[in-house]
């Protein structure tokens, strides 16, 4: 894969996941990415331009190294997530086609592929976009148990037993 960034050709590496595997990767800028199964990321060996850009298919948790001069941008089929330094999860969904962005710490912006909307998400916010209907939902104070694949733990406060058992 070749990308043109400021008239510089950058070769991209790719991490591809298989069934049942969770893999960790540290990028050249010290950003850390944990991939869920069946996920892939296209990324450059280094970030020579004015931005740090990667492309994600599937689901990954990002802990992005802060660098205000070089925003970190994640491209997906549904849109782009832009961040300066934070921790968040991105999950592409297939049925229905769409994306979920859950922010654990900091703030990110999400811009739809058609560039008709930009949404700022803060810690605890979850954006859900259905590509088929173009319906978007933003939940505040979201359930961080959605990160169980990454954290390996569930947390409940005043929850009903049925909710705990079903999770």
Where would I find each of the regions flagged by the language model?
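A residue-level detector for the "anchor" residue at the start of short, highly conserved motifs
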Residues: 1-167
């Amino acid at each position: 894969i070749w990308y043109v960034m400021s008239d510089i050709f950058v070769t991209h590496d790719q991490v591809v996941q298989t069934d049942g595997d969770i893999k960790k990767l540290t990028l050249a800028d010290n950003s850390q990415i944990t991939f869920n199964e069946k996920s892939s990321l296209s990324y450059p060996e280094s970030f020579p331009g004015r931005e740090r850009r990667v492309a994600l298919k599937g689901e990954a948790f990002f802990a992005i190294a802060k660098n205000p001069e070089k925003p970190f941008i994640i491209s997906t089929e549904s849109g782009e997530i832009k961040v300066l330094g934070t921790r968040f999860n991105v999950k592409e969904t297939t049925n229905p086609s769409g994306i979920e962005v859950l922010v654990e710490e900091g703030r990110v912006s999400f811009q739809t592929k058609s560039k008709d909307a930009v949404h700022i998400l803060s810690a605890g916010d979850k954006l859900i976009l259905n590509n088929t209907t173009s319906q978007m939902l933003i939940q505040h104070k979201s359930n961080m148990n959605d990160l169980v694949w990454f954290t390996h733990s569930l947390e409940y406060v005043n929850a009903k037993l049925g909710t705990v058992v079903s999770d």
